[in-house]
Amino acid sequence: HKAIRRQRQMCIRDRLWPEGKVPNYDNIAKFVNAGIRGVRAVDKDVPVMLHLDNGGNNALYREWFDEFTKRGEDFQIIGLSYYPFWHGTLDMLTDNMNDIAERYGKDLIVAEVSMGYTMEDYKDYEKLSDEERKGYATKQELVEKIEYPMTVQGQYDFMEDFLNRISHIKGNRGKGFFYWEPAWIPVPGSGWATEASLKYMNDKGPCGNEWANQALFDYQGNVLPTWNLIRDFKPEE
């Protein structure tokens, strides 16, 4: 869940920064290597994925993984986050994936991806006041930069193109993706954090859902065509 993930990220930042913040790669490697060794101690056969955000930023990936591979334990998978409203074009994602697939010889997984299907407000579904709501993550100024319209068809077309792109990464290194978050529709009580999480992070609540227009179900819970696309997808030759 997003609340758990965000809480974990904040704990990591609080405890590892500034010692573990870029460009302190010696320290970063020590922290990450300790985590890898912990995984190996439990099960030496578990694949390890190192996951960065901003999947269209090749310079970021080259710098981080160049520095880590000089110092790091072995890992099997590079994970990327890619949201078209934050991380550039599909061309940028594809170019980055092809480059790092060859450069590091690792399998790749897009560990986070989504595309909106509407800009219809969902305030009435959440039943929260304006002060309590988070609102959209996809602000209008971000939507205007996307190559695809934020419509049901736009979501479908984006995901079809995305799936074909990651299916043709050099060396067959593109191994899959995780859609974030397909079933997070705007019903009352479906905010991103529990009361305990909000208290821990000193954040106001209940905050609501800022991601509902990215789901694979509409606001009433009806499945969207993109769900069937993903289920039945076969890459273009």
Say what each PLM segment does.
Residues 32-44, 69, 97-102, 167:
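Surface-exposed amphipathic alpha-helices with a cationic face
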Residues 13-23, 47-53, 79:
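Active-site-proximal beta-alpha loop/turn segments in soluble metabolic enzymes
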Residues 1-12:
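Single conserved hydrophobic/aromatic residue that forms the stacking wall/gate
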